[in-house]
């Protein structure tokens, strides 16, 4: 272990513990890669399913407000209970997704960013840099009213102004004999503007250009508002900073963007409407080869608050092996990057470049360790049958050794 003085992290980091195999790995990461090198104040919340149940989920709410207060959270993967989990843990009720609860309290946009490692094959080999998908997690199909009708009739859309002035009425369609389906959806200008701010803040931070995709040629008013508000926020609030950093912003049609993304090498932020983001984030994750190499960062519109976590689940299958006393080969990379992304933001808020530098070094050490042929089983399988692999602790040992060397330089 290093005898060098620990690097001081000025502000606190809110730590959200989780479940199953990721909880085991999370503690190893903290004990082997974080605490030996950093003098850090951790504001700890146990979001393990039993503790959420014991506190009636109050711990999740408290954790979210702590992140709001301190500006940085790092989160371990958690169980979102279904019927089987309610039975397994004898839960009082089927608690909501902690991620949803935290997002509702903090607001903001979720950005999913792949970790690119040169010797891990990608389904899309040309993607040599990350594509970051920012998904507008509000409105559209996800807050829509939709229903079925089984007889002929008329569908009308009515907007009734709050000031009592004349309503706006659109007769949409006459439904024929056989019936059909109807969908009414909406979005709010303020939410779109906040989404734009978060997307531009992320781009500025990562030093990558930003693209927004819509279908404004068809939805002239609806998607037109996304296009116009992004343009306005960019011109008024970000253009000067973008140009100074040599960055660009562009709106593109969704079909054009999907085609372009397959041709381009990556290295940009792709701001997607709610449904597009839902679909494209999974397409992109698969294209890079592994959810085990995908980080997820929630960033608020003002760019001041960040919560980082791995984009994968709690790895239940490995946890069952672990409970049986067998070694597992669980990929810790996305969880390590949750720590590093949180630390980078903490360093930025505090004005402590040495903290940011430590986080960057840890990231490059992780990538270099895999590129040197040391990795967990999931990555070895992607490379091929000849590739050796390490168990979880051996891989973390290899990273710790390499980090030790890197920091000594």
Curated annotation (Swiss-Prot):
Describe activation and inhibition of this protein: Activity is repressed through acetylation by Rv2170.
Q: How is it modified after translation?
A: Acetylated at Lys-30 and Lys-129 by Rv2170, which decreases the catalytic activity.
Catalytic reaction list: D-threo-isocitrate + NADP(+) = 2-oxoglutarate + CO2 + NADPH
**Which Gene Ontology terms of cellular component type are present?**
plasma membrane
UniProt note: pH dependence: Optimum pH is 7.5. Can tolerate a wide pH range retaining about 30% activity in acidic pH 5.5 to about 90% activity in alkaline pH 9.5.
Q: What is its EC number?
A: 1.1.1.42
Pfam families from the entry? Iso_dh
Modified sites of kind N6-acetyllysine: 30, 129
Described function: Catalyzes the oxidative decarboxylation of isocitrate to 2-oxoglutarate and carbon dioxide with the concomitant reduction of NADP(+). Cannot use NAD(+).
NCBIfam families (UniProt xref)? nadp_idh_euk (TIGR00127), PRK08299.1 (NF006156)
The identity of this protein, by name, is: Isocitrate dehydrogenase [NADP] 1
């Amino acid at each position: 272990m290093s005898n060098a003085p620990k690097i001081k992290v000025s502000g606190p980091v809110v730590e959200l513990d989780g479940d199953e195999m990721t909880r085991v790995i999370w503690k190893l990461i903290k004990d082997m890669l974080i605490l030996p090198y950093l003098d850090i104040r951790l504001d700890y919340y146990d979001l393990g399913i039993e503790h959420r149940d014991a506190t009636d989920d109050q711990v999740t709410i408290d954790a979210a407000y702590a992140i709001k207060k301190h500006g940085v959270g790092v989160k371990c993967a958690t169980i979102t209970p279904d019927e089987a989990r309610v039975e397994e843990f004898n839960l009082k009720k089927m608690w909501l997704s902690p991620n949803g609860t935290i997002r509702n309290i903090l607001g903001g946009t979720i950005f999913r960013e792949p970790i690119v490692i040169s010797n891990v094959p990608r389904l899309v080999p040309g993607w040599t840099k990350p594509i970051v998908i920012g998904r507008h997690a509000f409105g559209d199909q996800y807050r829509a009213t939709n229903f079925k009708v089984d007889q002929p009739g008329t569908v009308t859309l009515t907007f009734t102004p709050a000031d009592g002035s004349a309503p706006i009425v659109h007769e949409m369609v006459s439904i024929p004999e056989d019936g059909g389906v109807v969908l009414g959806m909406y979005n709010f200008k303020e939410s779109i503007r906040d989404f734009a701010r978060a997307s531009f803040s992320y781009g500025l931070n990562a030093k990558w250009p930003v693209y927004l995709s819509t279908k404004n040629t068809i939805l002239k008013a609806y998607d037109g508002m996304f296009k116009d508000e992004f343009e306005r926020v960019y011109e008024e609030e970000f253009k000067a900073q973008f140009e100074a950093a040599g960055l660009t912003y562009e709106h593109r049609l969704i079909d054009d963007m999907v085609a372009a993304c397959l041709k381009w090498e990556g290295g940009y932020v792709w701001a997607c409407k709610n449904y597009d983001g839902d679909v494209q984030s999974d397409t992109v994750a698969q294209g890079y080869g592994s959810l085990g190499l995908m980080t997820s960062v929630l960033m608020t519109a003002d760019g001041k608050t960040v919560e980082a976590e791995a984009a994968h689940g709690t790895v239940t299958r490995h946890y069952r092996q672990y409970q049986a006393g067998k070694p597992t080969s669980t990929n810790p990379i996305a969880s390590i990057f949750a720590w590093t992304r949180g630390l980078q933001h903490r360093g930025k808020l505090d004005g402590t470049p040495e903290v940011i530098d430590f986080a960057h070094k840890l990231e490059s050490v992780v990538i270099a360790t895999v590129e040197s042929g040391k990795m967990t089983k999931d990555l070895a399988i992607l490379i091929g049958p000849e590739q050796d692999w390490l168990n979880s602790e051996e891989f973390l040992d290899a990273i710790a050794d390499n980090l030790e060397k890197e920091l000594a330089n």
